[in-house]
């Protein structure tokens, strides 16, 4: 049976994925009220992408994990964490912030044997990415992921457009997200390796001309 509920809504120009941390600077009065109400009721709020005037209907619940900083004027810096996904059925006004009647949803299928194979392929490719960029300095970070969580992590590092990130958020299987991430990451790593080769060739030529001159 599909679970439903009513949650506060926080439209943002960002796509939040499950398990993804999201720091926020809260300064508008309506969102100060939202955070205050969520803390008082120990409740999550929903992050929805708003892009080019469009408010998307599928989003991710955010749980307030920590209050990082409080300011004298009431502003807050908070750290949130993406939880389960939801679909808005009805937007409601009446409070300082929007609320939504939502249904919570997750992937339609269980993890298939193909997911583990994709997971291993992407994991190997990610090591190349880490060496090329230095962005992932702690190898245990990746080791702790499940294929489900890893499929969302890939969307974060692949530098997709907002609309593409939204499409990935709305995918209903880890296998589909991993396959998409593998294709994009392979292209990215290949391009980075080519850039390195070109830089080396140009550097060698520069050194050669300097010697000749």
Region spans (language model):
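N-terminal low-complexity, acidic/polar interaction/targeting segments
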Residues: 1-213
């Amino acid at each position: 049976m599909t679970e439903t509920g009513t949650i506060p809504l926080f439209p943002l120009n960002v796509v939040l994925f499950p398990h993804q941390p999201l720091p926020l600077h809260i300064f508008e009065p309506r969102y100060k009220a939202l955070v205050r109400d969520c803390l008082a009721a120990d409740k999550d709020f929903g992050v929805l992408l708003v892009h080019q005037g469009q408010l998307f209907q599928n989003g991710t619940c955010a749980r307030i994990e920590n209050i990082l900083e409080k300011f004298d004027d009431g502003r807050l810096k908070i750290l949130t964490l993406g939880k389960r996904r939801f679909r808005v059925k009805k937007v409601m006004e009446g409070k300082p912030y929007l609320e939504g009647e939502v249904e919570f949803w997750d992937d339609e299928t269980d993890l298939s044997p193909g997911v583990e194979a994709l997971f291993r392929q992407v994991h190997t490719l990610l090591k190349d990415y880490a060496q090329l960029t230095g962005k992932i300095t702690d190898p245990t970070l990746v080791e702790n992921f499940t294929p489900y969580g890893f499929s969302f992590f890939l969307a974060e590092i692949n530098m997709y457009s907002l609309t593409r990130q939204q499409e990935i958020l709305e995918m209903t299987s880890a296998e589909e997200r991993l396959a998409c991430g593998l294709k994009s990451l392979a292209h990215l790593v290949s391009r980075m390796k080519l850039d390195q080769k070109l830089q080396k060739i140009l550097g060698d030529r520069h050194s050669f001309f300097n010697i000749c001159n």
